[in-house]
């Protein structure tokens, strides 16, 4: 096994028995692939049947009303974005690119005859159709400067669905759901009548739809019912027994007798195959029936007197005596009737026709029109147009390829081509037939929660739909413009207005329910957000109406949606996460991978199955035992089939799971020993990992699952090498790789990677990248070059490994509280940097422009000390609450001054009185360091000094960066040819003769540009130098062009909102240490609040004097059933012990041979998966050992983790007791505790619920407008609510004065509180109470009812 650059530095020991069959696919592919499919930029490769291309093709051509103009679509191009991703975030712009569509305007001769079209002119040009947001490399969008994610939606797939309602009768219904257009429902009522509804409007008979389609009453009966022939004569009535085989399984309503009157089959018996044979053998072809039975029948076809053409009876008329007499009169002695005798099947449609009052197609169309447009008078043309537009015109109704596939599959017919996306007559007939079959018990209703009936709508499809909406509006505009514009040389540009497209797309990205502000607490929360599947949103469910069934875990979720990871609140089960190996197929259905089993042998061939396909197969679990030839060891094995868990013979198995972790999501797959935890706690664990705050120093988990590196790699937060090469330069801002062009498929000699430094994330955490490579290191493509935030050597690192003791300590871990050691605070283990952004906007007001200036009236010099001359705070200044960040003055209305004041103003030249200080100040409860300032101005007033200074710094930095980049390219070009040219014969060189030998000394005097002008006699060498010269010149031109582009984007004017003159953004870094009140958690749902930080000397300690870091309450485990944390602690202790063992060996010797022996014991003595130490050279072994001192990292994959024996063996090697317990001593007394305590290493996270963000106190502040009571909440600087129950408490204690204070001066007694404030200032401690404002509100509300309520001011004596 080969190891990557980062893995060699710290190899993770892997447990687990199952072989590695398939790599976890790229985690963000659901986003990137979907949007790529939408844009399909590369037209050369052929654009697919989706995305922009198909929408444009469907919308064009557009024809003018008079037929003179036609606008055709030809092609489209997507331009280059104005700013790059970083620039967009800084400027608050949207990362998008212009869409230019090539349109062809065909002009026809208006004088031509009506039926002929003569082309007069064709005009073609590219038309701007708005800006399309582009996706970043990490699957996000930058909209107005913020990163957003479009969450995929799980919605009901288009197609037909049959269901049964929950009422006692259990009425059956069918619903045809298109991708776009009207819904069509058919439903049975309790009487067996079939009703239809369009778009859930008023119901009407289902046969009305059939008549509207052009079917006659006779044809409808023929389609849906069998007919039988009855003969009659003077002896009575007889029923012909033809198609006997169709009667199998039906209940007989009469005896069947032979010619000798022997009963062959008795009445009320179900007919079997044997009975049919008996009847045939007896030669019985008809059976006598009585008139009572005949009178229940109905006529199957119209009965016409052939002689006169008179209609005796219509199809579906009842068979009556008078009808039979009429038949006899005209000599008809046999009658074709609907078969109600041998089957009930035909009765449903027959009964429905009885209710249906329409007689023909026209009447049926009018009936449908009345239902859809009640109150509108039906006109013949509009009636037909409405009905056809509902289901038969592709621009208004589309099943889409998915709907057509599902409809054909459900009805089991391929009569309709899969390219027809509208409804056909056979579809509607087929749906009604299937509904009747289901009612008769011959079919099954659909399970709406089955993932075969729900599909994923990803970002590309949603943007495509928005684009279609915008384009539809543009199309209407084009038609209007064509008829209004009268220009001789009309061009496509003149008639296309692209604003509706831009508006539709902008609305979707800014205010759509599924376009969300990216969760960016840490890399895992980013990845999980992009892999989220929501059932909410437009076209989906609403959380109020979603029942238990929709939210529940379904058998088809296996390997597709994670059964664990979902929110805990009202959205539980409606928001899911994609399972680790799942993917979305072309139809939008979720697929899971399986290994194919052929003749009892499990192959390595992988097949992806959708939920529909999977129902038909028997699938074995990943953990099923196989022999060395990949055959099943056991004869009877546990499998899944049709949604059930079964035990079956191994010979029946057709597929096998790929991996044990394929059932869970990426977040759940990060939890070691997941299989030993209760599911409710795992849900919390998976959700809380997403809330972990990245700390100052990242530390890998000692006990992981092997999924850490995959999440870190795919999150896009690490820098990954693009090509093979050698590290040429490293500093904190960039890494330069000299590319090995022979091994890499690229002509670039140099790869330069810029690192992100101290960037603010969406959650105000700090994004910072650190290089992990050194100059001279050899790297392969795909190796990690730099760690991002919350990663350590390319592994996800959300928290820290702490030594945990499960023991109570003086009540400080009551109810899940956590007791922490002071060492953790001193070592800055959980110290995190948070970057807050403060914005100050100077606007143009009615009274004049606001101004950002350091000259502010009535503000002390000390308050302005941290500002520069422009009135903006310096970078590096330490700011406290209340400090001015940006000094700003706002003009206020002129005041009328007295003559004395005017005189004084004139004497002292005071003019600042007509402005008010509206500076941006640091909010209460925060302090930090200013790390960055950005100034945006419009061009009107010229740029301020600070803006010019920032601009100059950015341009100088860019120039320095590009110069350094060019210097690297120069050195690489030099080193690539230097060895070969030294000692070569010269053809031509300035300062040397022809044929002279080139020396190193001569080269040292020349710059590289002069080197490359020398020509050589050796042709091969000359060619190599020529190539180097071309590369050098191209690189120089490219770098100059890049610099100019960067300079242009830096100096480019800013588009500020209307009325805004200047915007200043100040970024302040705030350092937060862990403290009591902060929330912490493990990975098993074990969460708690820090109750106390205890001095190290008071913490319990081991026999060797090592104090523990954390004390956790052991009572938090039994009731919660998350035993995984105990196993993690044991394995963590073993890992720590192994690290100590390596450290001791290092102290004795640094010889690689000795170290290899220790490493061999540590890595390869326990567990099935061995580490190939031979692949590492001696230097790498030494580096590895140095990195393992703190503990040997271990991977225990979910459902395939370390066993109890493995943990015991490792504990033994690490030098600990195999039960993981030890004697601890009290740090305060030095005495041992009464019994041994479980001690181990657990990975703990600090969550984004920090006490600093929640702690809040109010003195005086803002009040509510109506009630005049203080506002609530920290954001409003509000007060604490003294509610109803608290009032009762004070009443119960008789605390009258306290109660009066609470309900008046501290709340809404306006006069009383201002008097109180004055009294406190004056040093008087008295309280004057007035009427609370809420009483006035009540009084006014009562007055609004017409009752005058007021105080009775008269004295008692009166």
Curated annotation (Swiss-Prot):
- Determine if Nucleotidyltransferase is one of this entry's keywords: yes
Q: One GO term of the cellular component aspect?
A: DNA-directed RNA polymerase complex
- Give the record's GO biological process terms: DNA-templated transcription
An annotated Gene Ontology molecular function: ribonucleoside binding
Entries under Pfam families matching the protein: RNA_pol_Rpb2_1 (PF04563), RNA_pol_Rpb2_2 (PF04561), RNA_pol_Rpb2_3 (PF04565), RNA_pol_Rpb2_45 (PF10385), RNA_pol_Rpb2_6 (PF00562), RNA_pol_Rpb2_7 (PF04560)
What EC class does the entry list?
A: transferase
Specify the domain of life of the species encoding this protein: Bacteria
Q: Which InterPro entries match?
A: DNA-dir_RNA_pol_bsu_ext_1_sf, DNA-dir_RNA_pol_bsu_external_1, DNA-dir_RNA_pol_su2, DNA-dir_RNAP_su2_dom, DNA-dir_RNAP_su2_hyb_sf, RNA_pol_bsu_bac, RNA_pol_bsu_CS, RNA_pol_bsu_protrusion
Q: Which reaction does it catalyse?
A: RNA(n) + a ribonucleoside 5'-triphosphate = RNA(n+1) + diphosphate
Any idea which UniProt keywords this protein has? DNA-directed RNA polymerase, Nucleotidyltransferase, Transcription, Transferase
* Transferase as UniProt keyword: yes
Q: What is its EC number?
A: 2.7.7.6
Q: How would you summarize the oligomeric state and partners of this protein?
A: The RNAP catalytic core consists of 2 alpha, 1 beta, 1 beta' and 1 omega subunit. When a sigma factor is associated with the core the holoenzyme is formed, which can initiate transcription.
Protein task:
DNA-dependent RNA polymerase catalyzes the transcription of DNA into RNA using the four ribonucleoside triphosphates as substrates.
State the family named in the UniProt similarity comment for this chain.
Belongs to the RNA polymerase beta chain family.
Its recorded name reads: DNA-directed RNA polymerase subunit beta
Q: To which species is this protein native?
A: Francisella tularensis subsp. holarctica (strain FTNF002-00 / FTA)
Q: What is the lineage of its organism?
A: Bacteria, Pseudomonadati, Pseudomonadota, Gammaproteobacteria, Thiotrichales
């Amino acid at each position: 096994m080969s190891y990557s650059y980062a893995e060699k530095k710290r190899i993770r020991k892997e447990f687990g028995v199952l072989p590695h069959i398939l790599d976890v696919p790229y985690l963000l592919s659901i986003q990137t692939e979907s949007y790529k499919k939408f844009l399909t930029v590369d037209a050369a490769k052929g654009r697919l049947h989706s995305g922009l291309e198909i929408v444009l093709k469907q919308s064009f051509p557009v024809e003018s009303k008079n037929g003179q103009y036609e606008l055709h679509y030809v092609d489209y191009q997507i331009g280059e974005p104005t700013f790059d991703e970083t620039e967009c975030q800084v400027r608050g712009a949207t990362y998008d690119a212009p869409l230019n569509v090539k349109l062809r305007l065909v002009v026809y001769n208006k004088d031509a005859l009506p039926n002929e079209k003569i082309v007069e002119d064709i005009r073609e040009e590219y038309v701007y159709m708005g800006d399309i947001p582009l996706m970043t490399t990490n699957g996000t969008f930058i909209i107005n400067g913020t990163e957003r994610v479009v969450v995929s939606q799980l919605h009901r797939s288009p197609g037909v669905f049959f269901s049964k309602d929950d009422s006692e009768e259990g009425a059956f219904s069918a619903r045809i759901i298109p991708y776009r257009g009207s819904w069509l429902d058919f439903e049975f009522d309790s009487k067996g009548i079939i009703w239809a509804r369009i778009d859930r409007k008023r119901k009407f008979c289902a046969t009305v739809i059939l008549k509207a389609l052009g079917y006659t009453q006779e044809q409808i009966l023929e389609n849906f019912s069998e007919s039988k022939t009855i003969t009659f004569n003077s002896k009575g009535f007889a029923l012909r027994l033809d198609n006997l085989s169709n009667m199998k399984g039906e209940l007989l309503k009469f005896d069947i007798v032979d010619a000798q009157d022997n009963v062959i089959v008795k009445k009320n018996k179900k007919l079997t195959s044997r009975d049919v044979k008996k009847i045939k053998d007896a030669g019985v072809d008809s059976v006598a029936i009585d008139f009572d039975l005949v009178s229940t029948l109905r006529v199957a076809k119209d009965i016409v007197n052939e002689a006169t053409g008179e209609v005796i009876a219509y199809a579906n008329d009842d068979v009556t005596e008078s009808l039979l007499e009429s038949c006899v009169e005209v000599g008809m002695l046999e009658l074709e009737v609907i078969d109600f005798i041998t089957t009930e099947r035909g009765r449903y449609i027959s009964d429905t026709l009885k209710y249906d009052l329409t007689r023909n197609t026209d009447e049926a169309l009018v009936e449908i029109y009345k239902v859809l447009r009640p109150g509108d008078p039906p006109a013949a043309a509009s009636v037909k147009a409405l009905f056809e537009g509902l289901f038969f015109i592709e621009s208004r109704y589309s099943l889409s390829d998915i709907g057509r596939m599902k409809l054909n599959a459900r009805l089991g017919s391929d009569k309709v081509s899969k390219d027809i996306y509208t409804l056909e007559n056979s579809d509607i007939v087929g749906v009604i037939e299937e509904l009747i079959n289901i009612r008769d018990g011959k079919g099954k209703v659909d399970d709406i929660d089955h993932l075969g009936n729900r599909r994923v709508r990803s970002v590309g499809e949603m943007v495509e739909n928005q684009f279609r909406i915008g384009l539809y509006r543009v199309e209407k505009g084009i038609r209007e413009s064509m008829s209004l514009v009268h220009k001789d040389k009309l061009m496509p540009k003149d008639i296309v207005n692209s604003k509706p497209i831009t508006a539709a797309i902008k609305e979707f990205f800014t205010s759509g329910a599924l376009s969300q502000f990216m969760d960016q607490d840490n890399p895992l929360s980013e990845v999980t957000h992009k892999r989220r599947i929501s059932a909410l949103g437009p076209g989906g469910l609403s959380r109020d109406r979603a029942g238990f069934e929709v939210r529940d875990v379904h058998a088809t979720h296996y390997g597709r949606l994670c059964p664990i990871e979902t929110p805990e609140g009202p959205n539980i089960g409606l928001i899911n996460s994609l399972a680790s190996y799942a993917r979305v197929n072309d139809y939008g259905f979720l697929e899971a991978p399986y290994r194919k089993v052929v003749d009892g042998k499990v192959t390595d061939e992988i097949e992806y199955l959708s939920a529909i396909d999977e129902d038909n197969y028997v699938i074995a679990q990943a953990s099923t035992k196989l022999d060395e030839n990949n055959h099943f060891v056991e004869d009877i094995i546990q499998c899944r089939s049709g949604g059930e868990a079964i035990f079956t013979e191994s010979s029946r198995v057709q597929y096998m799971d790929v991996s044990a972790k394929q059932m869970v999501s990426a977040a759940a797959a990060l939890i070691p020993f997941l299989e030993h935890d209760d599911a409710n706690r795992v849900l919390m664990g998976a959700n809380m990992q997403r809330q972990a705050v990245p700390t100052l120093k990242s530390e890998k988990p000692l006990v992981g699952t092997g999924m850490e590196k995959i999440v870190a790699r795919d999150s896009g937060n690490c820098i990954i090498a693009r090509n093979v090469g050698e590290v040429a330069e490293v500093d904190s801002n960039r890494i330069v790789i000299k590319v090995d062009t022979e091994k890499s498929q690229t002509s670039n000699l140099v790869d330069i990677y810029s690192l992100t430094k101290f960037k603010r994330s969406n959650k105000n955490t700090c994004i910072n990248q650190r290089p992990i490579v050194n100059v001279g290191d050899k790297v392969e493509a795909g190796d990690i070059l730099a760690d991002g935030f919350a990663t350590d050597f390319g592994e996800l690192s959300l928290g820290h490994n702490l030594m945990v003791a499960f023991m109570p300590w003086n009540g400080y871990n009551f109810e899940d509280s956590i007791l922490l050691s002071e060492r953790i605070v001193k070592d800055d283990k959980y110290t995190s940097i948070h970057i807050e952004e403060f914005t100050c906007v100077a606007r143009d007001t009615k009274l004049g422009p606001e101004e950002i200036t350091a000259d502010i009236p009535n503000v002390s010099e000390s308050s302005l000390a941290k500002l520069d001359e422009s009135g903006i705070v310096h970078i590096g200044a330490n700011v406290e609450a209340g400090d001015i960040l940006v000094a700003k003055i706002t003009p206020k209305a002129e005041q009328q001054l007295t003559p004395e004041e005017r005189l004084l103003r004139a004497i002292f030249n005071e003019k600042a009185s007509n402005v008010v200080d509206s500076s941006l100040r640091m909010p209460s409860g925060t302090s930090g360091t200013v790390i960055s300032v950005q100034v945006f101005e419009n061009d009107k007033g010229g740029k301020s000094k600070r803006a010019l200074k920032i601009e100059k710094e950015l341009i100088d930095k860019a120039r320095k960066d590009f110069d350094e980049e060019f210097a690297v390219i120069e050195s690489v070009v030099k080193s690539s040819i230097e060895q070969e040219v030294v000692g070569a014969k010269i053809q031509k060189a300035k300062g040397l003769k022809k044929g002279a030998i080139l020396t190193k000394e001569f080269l040292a005097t020349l710059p590289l540009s002069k080197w490359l002008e020398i020509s050589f006699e050796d042709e091969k060498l000359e060619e190599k130098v020529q190539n180097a010269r071309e590369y050098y010149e191209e690189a120089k031109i490219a770098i100059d062009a890049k610099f100019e582009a960067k300079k242009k984007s830096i100096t480019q004017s800013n588009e500020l909102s209307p009325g805004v003159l200047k915007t200043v953004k100040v970024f302040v870094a705030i350092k937060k240490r862990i403290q009591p009140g902060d929330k912490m958690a493990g990975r098993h749902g074990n969460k708690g609040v820090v109750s106390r930080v205890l001095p190290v000397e008071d913490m319990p300690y081991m026999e060797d004097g090592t104090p523990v870091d954390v004390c956790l309450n052991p009572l938090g485990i039994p009731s919660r059933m998350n035993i995984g944390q105990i196993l993690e602690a044991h394995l963590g202790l073993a890992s720590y012990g192994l690290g100590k063992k390596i450290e001791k060996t290092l102290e004795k010797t640094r010889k690689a041979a000795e170290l290899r022996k220790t490493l061999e014991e540590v890595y390869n003595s326990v567990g099935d998966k061995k580490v190939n130490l031979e692949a590492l050279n001696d230097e790498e072994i030494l580096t590895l050992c140095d990195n393992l001192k703190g503990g040997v990292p271990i991977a225990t994959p979910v459902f395939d983790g370390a066993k109890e024996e493995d943990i015991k063996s490792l504990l033994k090697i690490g030098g600990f007791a195999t039960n993981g317990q030890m004697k601890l001593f009290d740090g305060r007394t030095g005495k041992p505790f009464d019994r041994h305590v479980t001690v181990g290493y657990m990975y703990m996270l600090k969550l984004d619920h920090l006490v600093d963000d929640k702690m809040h106190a109010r003195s005086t502040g803002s009040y509510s407008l109506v009630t005049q009571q203080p506002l609530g909440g920290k954001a409003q600087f509000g007060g604490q609510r003294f509610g109803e129950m608290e009032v009762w408490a004070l009443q119960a204690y008789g605390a009258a004065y306290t109660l009066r204070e609470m309900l008046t001066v501290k709340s809404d007694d306006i006069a009383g509180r201002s008097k109180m404030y004055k009294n406190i200032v004056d040093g008087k401690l008295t309280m004057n109470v007035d009427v609370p404002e809420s009483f006035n509100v009540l009084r006014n509300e009562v007055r609004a009812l017409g009752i005058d309520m007021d105080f009775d001011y008269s004295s008692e004596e009166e």
